[in-house]
UniProtKB/Swiss-Prot annotation:
Gene: nubpl
Name the record gives this protein: Iron-sulfur cluster transfer protein NUBPL
Cofactor binding note from Swiss-Prot or TrEMBL: Binds 1 [4Fe-4S] cluster.
Annotated localization: Mitochondrion
InterPro entries: Mrp/NBP35_ATP-bd, NUBPL-like, P-loop_NTPase, YlxH/NBP35
Gene Ontology molecular function: 4 iron, 4 sulfur cluster binding; ATP binding; ATP-dependent FeS chaperone activity; metal ion binding
Length: 323
């Protein structure tokens, strides 16, 4: 009898391909043995070790499967919202090709980061948030033309060669989609969980489903879904209009069995404060819009507490057993 245990990587293998290879091997070397393919589960053995970052308690990814839904604006204000709940917070701009954090955190014209005696970069800081971005290291108008491995290497340096100090939460603003940068973060970084940002319309929500399933496949917990640009309040009559549809993200979250963290309206001051590098959570902390972000941040804190206190969390992934 020929037996072997194979642990799968993050995605399920092609059973037909494995069966074909094994049958070929049997004919050549094990003609008198029987080969069987069984599904099973065992302890997680990832291909790439996820190494914790000293001093950082939680790392959360803010993601959107589709661009243009206001993810970076949400990431910035979520970071500031977490900080308003007396947490020490960092903000990492994972979008190497189109960094937004320098502008939104009013660090666009700041000098480049210094390094300490250990050759670690000192993160730039504003509004009490430690920030790191590729936008701090290159000229604003210079394009970054890199292939996947270079992106992964750059992200590792931004993340691990930065002197973050002590952080309760590091918020990572991911680029849209499910490309190299996101896979690097999921496979190499011990993410506590992911926050998905979407607008309410069907064309955005279809991508949300794919994004959520991607995080599930790489075993990153989903902290919840945020509905951005949820509605518009008329400044003259105060009537609410759901321009992109009503509660689309909330209903999607319910169908997928994930948490709905809250919604944020379309509002002129959110756009203006973001473009000027003076986020509304800081400049207008008592406004209804700032309260939306703070409430979402409070829900995220609750989810982080649940994950961190769950001693029975399932860390297993499927294996293939060949007997």
């Amino acid at each position: 009898m020929f037996k072997k245990l194979i642990t799968t990587p993050f995605f399920s293998p092609n059973k037909q391909f494995i069966t074909f290879q094994l049958e070929s091997g049997k004919r050549n070397y094990f003609s008198n043995n029987k080969i069987q393919l069984h599904g099973g589960s065992g302890h997680r053995q990832p291909q790439v070790t996820k190494v914790a970052i000293e001093g950082i308690k939680n790392i959360i990814a803010v993601s959107s499967a589709k661009g243009g839904v206001g993810k970076s604006t949400c990431a910035v204000n979520i970071a500031l919202g977490l900080s308003s709940h007396n947490l020490s917070v960092g903000l990492l701009d994972v979008d190497v090709f189109g960094p937004s954090i320098p502008l939104m955190m009013d660090l666009k014209n700041h000098e480049k980061p210094f390094t300490n005696e250990l050759n670690q970069m000192i993160p730039l800081q504003n509004y009490g948030i430690k920030c790191m971005s590729m936008g701090f290291l290159v000229n604003e108008d210079d394009p970054i033309i890199w292939r996947g491995p270079m992106v992964g290497s750059a992200l590792e340096k931004l993340l691990r060669q930065t002197d973050w100090g002590h952080l309760d939460v590091l918020v990572c603003d991911l680029p849209p989609g499910t490309g190299d940068a996101i896979l690097t973060m999921c496979q190499r970084v011990p993410l506590t969980g992911a926050v998905i940002v979407s607008t309410p319309q069907d064309v955005a929500l279809a991508d949300v489903v794919r994004g959520v399933n991607m995080f599930k496949k790489v075993e990153v917990p989903i902290l919840g879904l945020v509905e951005n640009m949820s509605y518009f309040n008329c400044p003259h009559c105060n009537e609410s209009t759901h321009i992109f549809g009503n509660e689309g993200a909330k209903n999607t979250a319910k169908k997928m069995g994930i948490n709905f963290l809250g919604d944020v309206p379309i509002h002129l001051q959110i756009r203006e404060t973001s473009d000027s590098g003076k986020p509304i959570t800081v400049t207008q902390p008592d406004s209804p819009q700032a309260k939306n972000y703070k409430d979402i941040s409070k829900e995220i804190i609750k989810q982080l507490e649940i994950i961190n206190n769950d001693e029975n969390k399932d860390n297993k992934e499927p294996n293939i057993i060949i007997t």
